[in-house]
Amino acid sequence: MESAVPQGRLAEIVRDAQTRTDVSRAAVALHVDGRTTFAGEHRRPFRIASITKSFTATAVSLAGLLDDRRRALLSHTAGYRPERPDPLPPECAGLWSYSNAGYREAASAFEGEYSAAVRELVLEPLGLRHTGFETPDDAVLGTLPGDVVADPSYAVERRPGGGLWSTVGDLVEYGLAHCGDWADLHEPVASALGAHYALGWWVRDGFLDHEGSVGGFQSLLLLVPERTVALAALTNSWRGSALIHHVVEDLGLAPPSAQAPFEVEAVDGRYELDGFAAVVADGSVTESEPDPVTGTGLERRYPLRPGATLMTWRSDFPRPGVARIGWVALPRVDR
């Protein structure tokens, strides 16, 4: 990646992406060549959803609580279901599978003081004054399919997996801290979806990133540590993933997407687990999942290309009869 990222065109790129995707509210901040540029509603806080996981992992590490068990929980290798601390089905045992429940268990190390620990260990030392768990008065509210405004409330016990509000400016500052420190959190623990997962971060060929999606919000924090580049993008729409994808592509910051060879006929079928479902047929994937906070069903369809592309498609088939769709290992159910 060259340093000639079109930083001066950031506002234009974001406006164009909003027009193409019909997303009403978005904010983007880009730090490159020692300078941060902003676009959109960058002074207002959005819910950052699962980007919170990096803050949780960072706090656990800084508190000296990072043992083997919590390392497994924070890397999604503990074998838990998406929202319950129960074992995955036998067909999926031993596979990497995304779990909010694992993050809640890891945060239990703070014995009920998780929110205070994140504030004292991470937010205050970094000067992140616009980041926190309580809904700010000037918060942007999320919108669900049908342009329904999402309820901003969020259960306290769910906070470790996705509860923070933040601005793109604060996220860039947080990202820059990770560009220069905490390398132990960036060491890959498991391989999945054409990339590697560390502790609260995806690792792909020199890039670190994490996406977020909950309650009508879509978000991304993307870093290139060796070049001290940080990009934060926040949106208030379920269509926000498309906007963020366009912005990343237009800035020339998209990590390479890895694919693996496969036989289409061998993976066609229906896969399900705990409300997550995927139908693989005719060279495409149709996935559906419940929003973990609102319960709203979300559906998307994309070409069958095992691996992942940032903010778009993500699927692989780690063993016969199992698909990892949308980051969750799902057993096949139509045999």
Which residues does each predicted region cover?
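Actinobacteria-biased recognition of intrinsically disordered, low-complexity terminal regions
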Residues: 1-9, 333-335
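Short amphipathic alpha-helical segments
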Residues: 7-15, 119, 268
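A short, well-structured edge-of-sheet supersecondary motif
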Residues: 12-45, 59, 71, 75, ...
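Short, surface-exposed loop or secondary-structure junction motifs
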Residues: 32-35, 68-225
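Short, well-ordered beta-strand elements
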Residues: 37, 220-237
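Catalytic tyrosine of NAD(P)H-dependent dehydrogenase/reductases that use a Tyr as the general acid/base
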Residues: 46-49, 96
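Active/ligand-binding-proximal structured segments within catalytic/core domains
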Residues: 52-56
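Peripheral terminal and inter-domain segments
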Residues: 246-335
